[in-house]
């Protein structure tokens, strides 16, 4: 049962910046802290930060969190109002800290707590803190915390540490390892397999379905969601994407996009933001997608750029296809219907539409719409000059004498 009705979190700033807004595995330390507390049932947050840090801090906490800066004229009143709305204990963190789930369990467990160096973590009754502040409004806040509450220490042995005071960026770097192992352990318990956990870097908000295998060199960031039975890696980076079930991503980068089930991506593919790749699609080697919709069962096997495009189902792209979407000022869209066949080395100069079932001949530069079930040929007629090379060689040899 959660023992904390709310949390007051300070984000101190020094000459090098605000340590709690520095990243631990791609997310600010404050976001890790907020996630740990929310998982334990803490619903109400009051964050004290520098005015310059407010915009960054807002992204780390729930939408209904309250924010106060030391210079706010009504800061004492807002603190009092926050405390008056709580019934029970409040957790107060006055220093940069990384708190694990196990650490929070120890903080909330009854009995003697581990002691060591100061952690900057306090627990106390919300009503008692409110009364003490009302009685002596000029007192230092941390003095009131020590007088009315209990500072919670941290174990001295590294292997047992669950509360990490972050005094500088070197300690922040050390905590990266702890955060990575905690994240991997959580995912393993949920049925995810790791070939080499020490080479996977996964942010705290990533969700992965059971049966998915994470290969070495994988980086997963942001609010990425990966389905069941996938194979990710080696050397894949995925940021803020939604990946379906049984998807393969091999040595590729995907950003802010959706990939439906049973699709394969890579190796060496680059999916840029705002793409929706359908199911049973092949996105092969050296393929780049940008701001495009790719229909089910389409194959883009190699050396192709598809940008600002709407592609139907069961389309085949030949090697070297380019959607020419930019004229130097404006981006234009390309539309390709179902069952179309795009020949190798085709340039599709947008805005242009290739109809359903239509073909483009290899080497064509398509500038006009192609009707359904038609063949477009846009290349020069081949001219063969017989014996031209032999004559040229003979002439060259004669000139050398």
Where in this protein do the model-derived segments appear?
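Catalytic-core segments of class I nucleotidyltransferases/pyrophosphorylases
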Residues: 98-186
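N-terminal glycine-rich phosphate-binding loop and ensuing alpha1 helix
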Residues: 1-57, 63-71, 104
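Glycine-rich hexapeptide-repeat left-handed beta-helix
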Residues: 249-401
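Residue-level signal for inorganic ion chemistry
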Residues: 30, 96, 168, 214
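Acidic, glycine-rich loop-and-beta core segments that form the ion-binding/anion-interacting portion
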Residues: 205-284
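Long, charged amphipathic helices and adjacent flexible linkers at domain junctions
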Residues: 176-203, 395
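Conserved beta-loop-beta/alpha segment of the NTase-like Rossmann-fold superfamily
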Residues: 54-131
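Short glycine-rich anion-binding loops that position phosphate/pyrophosphate groups of nucleotides
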Residues: 13-15, 95-98, 381
């Amino acid at each position: 049962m959660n023992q904390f009705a709310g949390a007051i979190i300070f984000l101190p700033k020094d000459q090098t910046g605000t340590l709690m807004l520095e990243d631990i595995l791609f997310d600010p330390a404050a976001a890790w802290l907020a996630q740990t507390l929310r998982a334990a049932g803490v619903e109400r947050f009051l964050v004290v930060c520098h005015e310059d840090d407010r915009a960054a801090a807002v992204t780390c906490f729930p939408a209904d969190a309250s924010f106060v800066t030391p210079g706010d004229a009504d800061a004492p009143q807002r603190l009092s109002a926050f405390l008056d709305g709580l019934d029970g204990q409040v957790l107060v963190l006055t220093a940069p800290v990384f708190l694990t789930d196990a650490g929070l369990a120890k903080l909330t467990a009854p009995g003697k707590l581990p002691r060591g160096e100061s952690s900057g973590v306090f627990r106390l009754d919300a009503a008692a803190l409110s009364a003490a502040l009302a009685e002596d409004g000029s007192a230092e806040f941390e003095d009131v915390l020590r007088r009315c509450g209990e500072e919670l220490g941290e174990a001295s042995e590294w292997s047992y540490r669950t509360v990490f005071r972050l005094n500088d960026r070197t300690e922040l770097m050390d905590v990266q390892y702890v955060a990575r192992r905690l994240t991997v352990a959580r995912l393993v318990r949920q049925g995810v397999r790791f070939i080499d956990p020490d080479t996977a870097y996964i942010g705290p908000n990533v969700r992965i379905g059971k049966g998915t295998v994470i290969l070495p060199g994988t980086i997963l960031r942001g609010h990425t969601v990966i389905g069941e039975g996938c194979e990710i890696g080696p050397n894949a980076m995925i940021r803020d994407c939604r990946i379906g079930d049984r998807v393969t991503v091999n040595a590729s980068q995907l950003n802010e996009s959706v990939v439906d089930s049973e699709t394969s991506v890579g190796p060496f593919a680059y999916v840029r933001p705002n793409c929706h790749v359908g199911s049973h699609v092949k996105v092969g080697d050296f393929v780049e997608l940008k701001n495009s919709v790719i229909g089910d069962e389409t194959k883009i096997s190699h050396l192709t750029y598809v940008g600002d495009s709407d592609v139907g189902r069961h389309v085949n792209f030949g090697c070297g296809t380019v959607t020419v979407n930019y004229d130097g000022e404006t981006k234009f869209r390309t539309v390709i219907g179902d069952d179309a066949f795009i020949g190798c080395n085709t340039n599709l100069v947008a805005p242009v539409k290739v109809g359903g079932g239509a073909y483009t001949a290899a080497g064509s530069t398509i500038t006009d719409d192609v009707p359904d079930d038609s063949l477009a040929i846009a290349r020069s007629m081949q001219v063969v000059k017989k014996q031209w090379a032999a004559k040229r060689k003979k002439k060259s040899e004669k000139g050398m004498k």
